[in-house]
Curated annotation (Swiss-Prot):
Family to which this protein belongs: Belongs to the eukaryotic ribosomal protein eS4 family.
CDD domains: KOW_RPS4, S4
UniProt xrefs under InterPro entries: KOW, Rib_uL2_dom2, Ribosomal_eS4, Ribosomal_eS4_central_region, Ribosomal_eS4_central_sf, Ribosomal_eS4_KOW, Ribosomal_eS4_N, S4_RNA-bd
One GO MF term attached to the UniProt entry: structural constituent of ribosome
An example Gene Ontology biological process: translation
Residue ranges constituting the S4 RNA-binding domain according to the UniProt record: 23-85
Highest taxon above the source species: Eukaryota
Protein name: Small ribosomal subunit protein eS4
UniProt KW keywords: Ribonucleoprotein, Ribosomal protein, RNA-binding, rRNA-binding
PROSITE patterns per the UniProt record, alphabetical: S4
GO cellular component: cytosolic small ribosomal subunit
Keyword Plastid attributed: no
Length: 194
């Protein structure tokens, strides 16, 4: 009996990414990187505080790592970014330490909090106060992981590169050609395959 899948698969704990759109740390270390054979060994690795996600040490073996997260293992000097491959699965994508200093986030919503402070919420549940007033929903912002500040942003615009993060075309990369507004239902964004 295969005890690693189906009902026995590790359920990701609650965290910044949705249950359906994340990868528990234990799978990443055990099945993807082959650093451990059993769940116990993953626990031992995590408890020695080697693993960092987005620059913070995570010891929870079922911590949900999701799209665009940076996983760094100081002991081996490796950095990974979680990215979908064309089939819509998470790929192990190694990156340089320079690239591991930032991540890209999609802006989910923008609202004005108490005393008129503008807030911005990203796809991995980060809340940032006082964002640039030019940033709108669906834009992409580049976040410096050490400070959590916005360093740069890309408008949601025609002619930009994009990556599909959900649905049947998950993981496909293309150029935004045009966007149809459908008031009351979903907008349709036409993407030309790269």
């Amino acid at each position: 009996l295969d005890k690693l899948t189906g009902v026995f698969a590790p359920r990701p704990s609650t965290g910044p990414h949705k249950l359906r759109e994340c990868l528990p740390l234990i799978i990443f270390l055990r099945n993807r990187l082959k650093y451990a054979l059993t769940g116990d060994e993953v626990k031992k690795i995590c408890m020695q505080r080697f693993i960092k996600i987005d620059g913070k040490v995570r010891t929870d073996i079922t911590y949900p790592a999701g799209f665009m997260d940076v996983i760094s293992i100081d002991k081996t000097g490796e950095n990974f970014r979680l990215i979908y491959d064309t089939k819509g699965r998470f790929a192990v994508h190694r990156i340089t330490p320079e690239e591991a200093k930032y991540k890209l986030c999609k802006v989910r919503k923008i609202f004005v909090g108490t005393k008129g402070i503008p807030h911005l919420v990203t796809h991995d549940a980060r809340t940032i106060r006082y964002p640039d007033p030019l940033i709108k929903v669906n834009d992409t912002i580049q976040i410096d992981l050490e400070t959590g500040k916005i360093t740069d942003f890309i408008k949601f615009d025609t002619g930009n590169l994009c990556m599909v993060t959900g649905g049947a075309n998950l993981g496909r990369i293309g150029v935004i050609t045009n966007r149809e507004r459908h008031p009351g239902s979903f907008d349709v964004v036409h993407v030309k395959d790269a």
